[in-house]
Regions:
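A generic structural signal for residues embedded in beta-strands
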Residues: 107-108, 133
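Short loop segments at secondary-structure junctions
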Residues: 111, 127-130, 160
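Catalytic cysteine-centered active-site loop
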Residues: 41-102, 113, 142, 149-153
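Intrinsically disordered, low-complexity
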Residues: 1-48, 98, 149-160
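Paired acidic/hydrophobic, glycine-rich loop segments that form the ligand-binding mouth/hinge
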Residues: 105-107, 124
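Short, compositionally biased
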Residues: 3-10, 117-130
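Catalytic Cys-His active-site segments of thiol-dependent hydrolases/isopeptidases
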Residues: 75-81, 122-145
Length: 160
């Protein structure tokens, strides 16, 4: 099944409520697809830096390393998104925007913060111009549109 990702896709039914059904998305590696699928399953979980390693709670970097750990890649255990980015860059795992596939990691730099490349946020690309990330305490883990124009210094990586 390399190159195929199953994700939940919302649609409204006749009664006006939302149905969630599986939709297949092409592209991505087997591990990347699995990490993306796991990330989608975390949508609705809470956001907390203090409880980032407890069941049902994530911050942005713990969402990435825990989804990838569940998919079989255990080296992404940095305390921050910047730590994860530095490891992936140093090990030659970056990709360009045109190469993005489900499971790839998107790193955000908003302002100078003294961390590696000023990275302060991270998300998992799930295909179809969408991503999953632990947004903040009020939103928790969410599925959002991916807008590359929001990135000041784009950095994308594909763990292997």
């Amino acid at each position: 099944l390399d190159g195929v990702l199953d994700v939940y896709e919302p649609s409204s039914n006749a009664a006006g409520s939302i149905d969630w059904s599986w939709k297949r998305i092409a592209g991505g590696s087997e591990v990347g697809n699995l990490a993306a699928q796991i990330a989608v399953s975390k949508v609705g979980c809470g956001y907390s830096q203090a409880m980032r390693d407890e069941e049902g709670w994530y911050d942005c970097s713990s969402l990435v390393y825990r989804c990838y750990a569940e998919a079989g890649i255990t080296y992404l255990n940095g305390k921050t998104a910047a730590d994860e980015a530095k490891y992936l860059v140093e090990h030659g795992m970056t990709v360009s925007a045109s190469e993005l596939q489900p499971g790839d990691i998107i790193f955000y730099s908003y302002e100078s913060n003294g961390r590696y490349r000023n990275i302060s946020h991270v998300a998992i690309y799930i295909g179809n111009d969408e991503m999953v990330h632990a947004a903040n305490p009020s939103r928790g883990v969410v599925r959002d549109p991916f807008r590359p124009s929001n990135l000041t210094e784009p950095l994308y990586a594909r763990p292997q």
